[in-house]
């Protein structure tokens, strides 16, 4: 289809089909006005879809035509014998060859990449959808996230579900949930949903629904998240009653021993930290929290809530804004991101390869999480992360899934049987199971 003549013929054919389709659409609209029954409404919907599809195809062919014309101009352009492009400022040719032309027309420098998202607008948009389509989209972007992103990179995808629709003049139309799948060069607008922003906002708004359906990202599954959240209320209660190494209470003479004991607990340190967080609120995030509180969302208001750790079940790349002012929550997410880095470091260490190849397999989830969360207006308390690591670190590392589920004794027995059989039938060295 690279030939200009063929493309022009396709454009002409599609333009003719579009004229006919638009006329049929007008006839269908008139029929619905006269008799708005189901048959006429379905016909109208089909006509609208046909027109939309033809418009998309026509636009695509016109883009192809523009590209083909541009290529033809480049091919016919006389080449400079010196090998220097006409608009290059160098007087002598560079030792480097000319590379790709990077088109920056689409970039808006008023909204640079990496900016803080407009969480209020994003939250209001997501809350406007039904729970089923939100959770199904979350499943596609977390449990099956790698596959979905790979198949749709560089496009703006639409999620569709029968539970999500809107009535326009009595006609039921699908209400699509839009998510942008950026490449490394993409510039995202403040209110634009990306997979990372979507996981962040949905995990923060609907942790109870995520818990009930057990939706979990693979990167959380392999660090033993299921084990960690199994008895969360008891786990966090025991943690709060432990002695905090960072507190040295000023005790007045005659203070009861029981009160002195209480003042040394982690709970008191968390109460002090909550006072600091209460002074650092951002207006837009407060507005989002108030808006969410008036609807269906189930954001935790305390780290001891049963659904609190489920905020991180789908591995959001930062602390969700709806619970960023709940003491200990942002640090809990940081603890999970460190565990992910620890597991990846273990996996990289046990693989065969050069030091450089092993380094490539390491990750920096923690640094990314820290940077993104702090861009939302709070500083993480490293001491709380340290308390989590001291309390649960060893236990969690023992529950990592390291891709080696075979019992050592079983592996040894199987290997000895392989060695014996290979020696019977061959003089080659047996491979390791």
Swiss-Prot record:
Organism: Puumala virus (strain Udmurtia/894CG/91)
Function: Encapsidates the genome protecting it from nucleases. The encapsidated genomic RNA is termed the nucleocapsid (NC) and serves as template for transcription and replication. The nucleocapsid has a left-handed helical structure. As a trimer, specifically binds and acts as a chaperone to unwind the panhandle structure formed by the viral RNA (vRNA) termini. Involved in the transcription and replication initiation of vRNA by mediating primer annealing. Plays a role in cap snatching by sequestering capped RNAs in P bodies for use by the viral RdRp during transcription initiation.
Lineage, uppermost ranks: Viruses, Riboviria, Orthornavirae, Negarnaviricota, Polyploviricotina
Segments of this protein annotated with the region Interaction with host UBE2I/UBC9: 188-191
Subcellular location: Virion; Host cytoplasm, Host perinuclear region; Host Golgi apparatus, Host cis-Golgi network
Name this protein carries in UniProt: Nucleoprotein
Interaction with host RPS19, as annotated region: 150-175
Segments of this protein annotated with the region Homomultimerization: 1-79, 100-125, 377-425
Family: Belongs to the hantavirus nucleocapsid protein family.
Annotated domain remarks: The N-terminus is required for chaperone activity and, in trimeric form, this region likely serves in high affinity vRNA panhandle recognition. The N-terminus also contains a coiled coil region, which probably participates in but is insufficient to initiate N trimerization. The YxxL motif is indispensable for the interaction with host MAP1LC3B. The central region is involved in specific RNA-binding. Has distinct cap- and RNA-binding sites so it can bind simultaneously both the vRNA and mRNA cap.
S-S bonds: none
Annotated site, Important for the endonuclease activity, chain positions: 88, 103
Chain span(s) of sequence motif YxxL: 178-181
Annotated spans, Chaperone activity: 1-100
């Amino acid at each position: 289809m690279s030939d200009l003549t063929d493309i022009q013929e396709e454009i002409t054919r599609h333009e003719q089909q579009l004229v006919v389709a638009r006329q049929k659409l007008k006839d269908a609209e008139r029929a619905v006005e006269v008799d708005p029954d189901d048959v006429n409404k379905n016909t109208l919907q089909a006509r609208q879809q046909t027109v939309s599809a033809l418009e998309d195809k026509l636009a695509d062919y016109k883009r192809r035509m523009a590209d083909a014309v541009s290529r033809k101009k480049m091919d016919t352009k006389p080449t400079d014998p010196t090998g220097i492009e006409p608009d290059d400022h160098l007087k002598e040719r560079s030792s480097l060859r000319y590379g790709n032309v990077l088109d920056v027309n689409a970039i808006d420098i008023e909204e640079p990449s990496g900016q803080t998202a407009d969480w209020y607008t994003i939250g209001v948009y997501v809350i406007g959808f039904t729970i089923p389509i939100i959770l199904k989209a979350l499943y596609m972007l977390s449990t099956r996230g790698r596959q979905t992103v790979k198949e749709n990179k560089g496009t703006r995808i639409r999620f569709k579900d029968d539970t999500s629709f809107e009535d326009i003049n009595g006609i039921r139309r699908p209400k699509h949930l839009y998510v942008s799948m950026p490449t490394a060069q993409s510039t995202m607008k403040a209110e634009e949903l990306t997979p990372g922003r979507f996981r962040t906002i949905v995990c923060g708004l609907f942790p109870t629904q995520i818990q009930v359906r057990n939706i979990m990202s693979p990167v959380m599954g392999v660090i033993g998240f299921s084990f960690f959240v199994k008895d969360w209320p008891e786990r966090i209660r025991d943690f709060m009653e432990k002695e905090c190494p960072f507190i040295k209470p000023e005790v007045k003479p005659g203070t009861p021993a029981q009160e002195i004991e209480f003042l040394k607990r982690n709970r008191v340190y968390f109460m002090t930290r909550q006072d600091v967080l209460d002074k650092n609120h951002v207006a837009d995030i407060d507005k989002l929290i108030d808006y969410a509180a008036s609807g269906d969302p189930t954001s935790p208001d305390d780290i001891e809530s049963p659904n609190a750790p489920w905020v991180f079940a789908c591995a959001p790349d930062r602390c969700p804004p709806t619970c960023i002012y709940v003491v200990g929550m942002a640090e809990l997410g940081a603890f999970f991101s460190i565990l992910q880095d620890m597991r990846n470091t273990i996996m990289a260490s046990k693989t065969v390869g050069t030091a450089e190849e092993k380094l490539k397999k390491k990750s920096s989830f923690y640094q990314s999480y820290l940077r993104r969360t702090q861009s939302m207006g709070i500083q993480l308390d490293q001491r709380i992360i340290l308390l989590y690591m001291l309390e649960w670190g060893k236990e969690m590392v023992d529950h990592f899934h390291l891709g080696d589920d075979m019992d050592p004794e079983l592996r040894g027995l199987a290997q000895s049987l392989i060695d014996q059989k290979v020696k019977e039938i061959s003089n080659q060295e047996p491979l390791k199971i």
